[in-house]
Amino acid sequence: MDTKTQIIDYDGNIMEDLKEWMIRNKLANLGFNYNVIAILGSQSSGKSTLLNNLFKTSFDVMNTKLGHSQTTQGLWLSFDTFEDSSAGPSEQGSTTRKVNPTLILDVEGNDSKERGDNRLTFEHRSALFSLALADCVIVNLWYHSLGNFTASNYGLLKTVMEVNLELFQQDENCPKTILLFTVRDWFEEFASIDIVKNKIVEEYLNKIWTEMKKPPEAEKVNISNYFIVEVVGLSHGIIKKEEFLKDVENLRQKWINQLRPLQYSRNIPSDGFAHYCNNIWNTIVKQSQLDIPSQKEMLATFRCQEIKNNVISNASKVIKEKLAASSSQHSSTSIDEFKPWAEKEVVEKSLDEYFVDASRYTESICLKTSEELLDSLFIQLQTIVDNNLNFTQRVLAAKFANELNTMYSVCASDKNVFLFSKESNLQVRKDGKGGSSPSAGDKKDTKDTRSSQDKCIRLWSSFLLNADKLEYNTLCKFFEDYQKCNIEVKKRNKTHEFNYKPSLSILSTAICKDLNRIRNAQLTVLLDRTRATIKSRFKNMESLLITTKNPEEYWNHTLKIVKALQESINSNLTKCFINLKGGGAGPGSITTAGIIPNGGLYNDEDNTFHEDNLVEAHNSLSDNQTGHENDHYVEENLLNFHKIDVIKNKGKYISTVGEEIDKQVKNKNAIAELNSYYLDEIMDVLKSKLDEISDNLSSIIIQRFESVFNYDDAEQPRQWREISMAELKKIFRESKNYAFLIIDILQKNVQVEIIDDYLPNNFIKDEIVEKGKNKAKRKIQEMCRDAQYIQETGAKMSLKNVPLFFWVILLILGWNELLFFTRFFFRLNIILPLFLAAAVILSTLVFNGNMEVLSIINKAVFFLAKNSFGVYRQLQAMGGKAAQGAAAD
């Protein structure tokens, strides 16, 4: 294992592998439990040899046999873990304490002839670097050089003290640096160590301190405020080697038990030591002002960011695994399990991992970076929260649509036409909710059809209110699930609330789309039933055409139907149309976004109602719902956020949809436009009915002709054989004129209010009129010829004209043949058909001239005759079997 490494080379470049070296030697996780010693002194003064004996290091030493030369170039770093030593008895007992490792910095010797005149720059930099890092600076000097300037390191001491003041003058809590003077080749016989120490302190340190140019605030400060001065004498390493080794061992124990700080005095955690060295050296080389507190802050920022990134990297793996699991299988349990998992497995675990190392650095920076860590974790956790909330919103949106569909399924299944009641549902109830509902007695008395109709009308009249309440309940459930996702950060004593707005926007949009879809579907059902009702009121238009005698009568009657329909629809269905279609100029002008989210908040403390001002911005009318669909979604989202605020504040949500509907009911312009819409629908159905009548014009003309031509004033069938030819022609002319009067009626050559705005005079095309007239003329002429034929031949064909004696002679002469045929018929079992034939003859005599009745009788007789043959065959077979059985007996 490489127990030493060069951190700064001869050219003054800092090496980049210090961190890896510390990690390999298990020095990066010591926290503050380590120390740093640097040694300064003249070149070839035995610094590396002293360190090797004192701390069991392996720095390169000079081979004197090869001559004096520079051995240590730049700065080298090694360590001693003191595994063979202990810190001695503890205060509480005889147990020994483990000794913190010490990093040993071997600095290139000063006064080097190899560097020449450039040595001062490197010496100053290395001294500054050593003082910035070391708890203890060893000043290595020879005893016999104490009176010299260069050899005694007087200049080096001055540099050390100036640099130390430069470094720590701004730090009120600056750590004291241990200045350990190792006096080499010292003999007790020369002078005691106390005299040597006094000489060093008085003639060197105090003198230098007095002569130094100090800032005003340090003028009266004693040198002891910055340094702890220790002097140790070491015997000659060659002449008295055993004593030298003994002195070194004593110094080792003194370091372990007395001089060594319990923790690194520079307050740099070991994991940031390499980066701190890099920053310090680069600042020194750039000849910038070396500000130790700023350097510590820079290091704290760097290390806290580095620790934060490592923690985030570890947490990201856990979050990704959870995200993959939650994406593959969504359920309500995943939402319930999220909060404890996120709090313990992600947030608390990450904070604990972060503070293990980061807490050693500047507190303010550590805490600030921990907030950044939390923010980063929350951003990643937001993805899982979004997944959970998106699952929730999909379930809730589907539930909303299903419940609303189920609520209105009865309306979609009922296809009956409306049986309008006289009571109007436009009345506003005193409770402000609008609408009217039948009393219990009325419900018992109404029929099933009317009961179903009333139920549908009540549902349609409160569609927006029901949807609003259902939407609010949906948002309450959404917010309940959202609150399960919020995380409590116990170490911060706060709760983090995730962003729910994207999921709420999706939910609001889905609700709005489903609401409009169901609303449009119900509007279609309402329109279909309304049109069917209108059509049923116009079903007698054809019958009226057959009996009406002038255009004024026909169109006045039609106008009464139109007005009655308009009034009935307005009285019974206006609230339905306001809810499903909207009031105003165009479809959807009363939109879901404009009314549904319009709610208020009751404050439980003062019971006062606070109306949201946003509502006023969403009551405007629109001519095209499709063109503003996106705007409606935006409005829906904004107002649903308002509902969430109501839920957050635990207030009472009071829907004002009923009040908005009532305002529309009282709005004369809105009602007028709805009435215009009703009239448009009524007239569309009327036009369709008139088009249908136009297509069947010939049939109606013929029916009008038959109603006069075939029946007299008493509505009895005419007996053409009793009517003369002149009278027949007169009846034909009157019937024809009456029949073709329908054309003048349909062409509406009269002034009729309301209807004139939709149907112009002569609205039936001439081609259709001519085609119907021609077809009707042919049929009328055919009917007239039939009447003439009956008139001419009816009397001759009558059996009443045959003389009585003819029947007597026929009976006498045909008696035998009559008996023969009678026996024959009974033998063949065809007596029933004969009776049927007789019935035909009889009916002919009775209903002579009534062609329709005769036709019906003939068809009935033919059917009975056709089916009676098989019956008699079966009876004949049964009779034959019975005869055979009797013969056998």
Swiss-Prot record:
Identify the GO cellular component terms for this protein: endoplasmic reticulum membrane
Where do the annotations place GTP binding?
Answer: G41, S42, Q43, S44, S45, G46, K47, S48
- Chief localisation class: endoplasmic reticulum
Q: Which residues form a coiled coil?
A: 679-699
Free-text function comment from the UniProt entry: Probable GTP-binding protein involved in generating and maintaining the structure of the tubular endoplasmic reticulum network.
Residue ranges for the region (Disordered) are 429-449
Keywords from the named record: Coiled coil, Endoplasmic reticulum, GTP-binding, Hydrolase, Membrane, Nucleotide-binding, Transmembrane, Transmembrane helix
Where in this chain does the record put each GB1/RHD3-type G domain? 31-277
Membrane topology per the record? Answer: Multi-pass membrane protein
Where, in residue ranges, is this chain on the Lumenal side?
A: 823-825
What protein family is recorded? Answer: Belongs to the TRAFAC class dynamin-like GTPase superfamily. GB1/RHD3 GTPase family. RHD3 subfamily.
Name of protein: Protein SEY1 homolog
Which GO terms label this protein's molecular function in UniProt? Answer: GTP binding; GTPase activity
Keyword Coiled coil among record annotations? yes
Pfam assignment, any one: RHD3_GTPase
> Any idea of its EC number?
3.6.5.-
Cross-referenced InterPro entries: G_GB1_RHD3_dom, P-loop_NTPase, RHD3/Sey1
* Superkingdom of origin: Eukaryota
> From which source organism is this entry?
Plasmodium vivax (strain Salvador I)
Q: Where in the cell is it found?
A: Endoplasmic reticulum membrane
Ligase as a keyword?
A: no
Q: Which residues cross the membrane?
A: 802-822, 826-846
Q: Which residues lie on this side of the membrane: Cytoplasmic?
A: 1-801, 847-889
Q: Which Gene3D superfamilies match?
A: P-loop containing nucleotide triphosphate hydrolases
Any GO BP: endoplasmic reticulum membrane fusion
